[in-house]
């Protein structure tokens, strides 16, 4: 009897095969259950070790509870849930770090794990995604940041000639600022100093980056600078467009703000790109750099040509405009905000202003202007600067971070790709580190001998720490010291007695004082400032 082995005929079943199959199925089920139990236990452990936090409402999460003054909301929540807690903004889970211990453990001890930026829509817009400040953490990012930091350090803090150039830029703008403040205060009038400080600081950074300055009346320059507050609100912690991206898909105020944000970034990028192209065209081969843009272009061209002389990392040429955008944009905004705080505090604490002026008169005298060389001998001026930074915490929460790997802080599990907010304000207002933190007291930074306490100054957190620490920190502190020293040496500042004692502020990436009025009078005359600027111009003409 013949047999057929057609592909359509079933194979005969062997009883042993049935037993083996049953055993394999049973083992598979047991293995699946075992793995599932392990994963469930691991998930439960992670949930048990996840940071605590408040109940989050559907759709909006904790957005309503955070409000505008996010740093204060975070500090209040930290008192209930601890220094590491979790909130939800929209559908985005966010871990918030408060206090020096938690922040140091995350950003310094585990710097690489917390060095990324979230994939936020607003971050992708800045400099077309090439921004160092808002860009993702990668090997390429590390090389570019190291190059930019090295260039800034060498260009302004290590070379005496470059430091003198910076002092000259600040002197010129301080002279113009004094003249405008005094003119606006004629006949006992009071004026809002904020617009003038914005242009003054931006002009210093324009001279540093591009080798040029603008008139305070220049409409295009003033328009460019007028969007600082809008930019800060959009990229700051808790921006709705980033945590509720679905708001971009139908008409609403958030979408309108985001489209305006896109336009202002295009305008700003075009402004920087125009400067970059003009510098590339006018830069002579072998010439010394005229400004920071030149220095970055020359470094990038050497890298492109394969010149490794001098070693160290170098910027890619295509990244120069974005890097200059970061330096110019961030510096002029944060420094003008800081200078506004310094003037506000002078008027609200006249005894502090008097003591600053007395120290300047004693150390510098009345026959010349303060300079960087005077800084070691002006401890109270430095104490005033650091107390102003601590008290105002004008950058209350850093640009949002993101984790690059599964990690933990103070025993709490934080998964990879988690958005992290860092509350710098909580460090600067910690009552365990700063007695009576809500009191403004520069003397807290002086030791028993009246010298600056460097251990305390290092605890002030305003420029972040770790891998994302601001590369312009030294340059910023130099400018603030020079500005406030020259202004205090030359002028008296008086508050408007009709203004309420309680101040109002706008919140975003920085805390900005809202409108306040001052009266500014010369302590002597403009002669010393005029003479110093004329001498500076004469030296520049001879060079």
Curated annotation (Swiss-Prot):
GO terms for molecular function: estrogen 16-alpha-hydroxylase activity; estrogen 2-hydroxylase activity; heme binding; hydroperoxy icosatetraenoate dehydratase activity; iron ion binding; monooxygenase activity; oxidoreductase activity, acting on paired donors, with incorporation or reduction of molecular oxygen, NAD(P)H as one donor, and incorporation of one atom of oxygen; oxidoreductase activity, acting on paired donors, with incorporation or reduction of molecular oxygen, reduced flavin or flavoprotein as one donor, and incorporation of one atom of oxygen. The record marks 395 as: Major determinant of CYP1B1 17beta-estradiol hydroxylation regiospecificity. Expressed in heart, brain, lung, skeletal muscle, kidney, spleen, thymus, prostate, testis, ovary, small intestine, colon, and peripheral blood leukocytes. Expressed in retinal endothelial cells and umbilical vein endothelial cells (at protein level). Heme binds at residue 470. SUPFAM superfamilies: Cytochrome P450. Changing residue 203 to S: In GLC3A; reduces enzymatic activity. Its cofactor is heme. It is found in: Endoplasmic reticulum membrane; Microsome membrane; Mitochondrion. One of its GO terms (biological process) is positive regulation of receptor signaling pathway via JAK-STAT. GO terms for cellular component: endoplasmic reticulum membrane; intracellular membrane-bounded organelle; mitochondrion. Changing residue 437 to L: In GLC3A; allele CYP1B1*23. Pathway: Steroid hormone biosynthesis; Cofactor metabolism; retinol metabolism; Lipid metabolism; arachidonate metabolism. It comes from the Eukaryota. It catalyses: an organic molecule + reduced [NADPH--hemoprotein reductase] + O2 = an alcohol + oxidized [NADPH--hemoprotein reductase] + H2O + H(+); 17beta-estradiol + reduced [NADPH--hemoprotein reductase] + O2 = 2-hydroxy-17beta-estradiol + oxidized [NADPH--hemoprotein reductase] + H2O + H(+); 17beta-estradiol + reduced [NADPH--hemoprotein reductase] + O2 = 4-hydroxy-17beta-estradiol + oxidized [NADPH--hemoprotein reductase] + H2O + H(+); estrone + reduced [NADPH--hemoprotein reductase] + O2 = 2-hydroxyestrone + oxidized [NADPH--hemoprotein reductase] + H2O + H(+). It is a peripheral membrane protein. Its EC number is 1.14.14.1, 4.2.1.152. Its main location: endoplasmic reticulum. A cytochrome P450 monooxygenase involved in the metabolism of various endogenous substrates, including fatty acids, steroid hormones and vitamins. Mechanistically, uses molecular oxygen inserting one oxygen atom into a substrate, and reducing the second into a water molecule, with two electrons provided by NADPH via cytochrome P450 reductase (NADPH--hemoprotein reductase). Exhibits catalytic activity for the formation of hydroxyestrogens from estrone (E1) and 17beta-estradiol (E2), namely 2- and 4-hydroxy E1 and E2. This is Cytochrome P450 1B1.
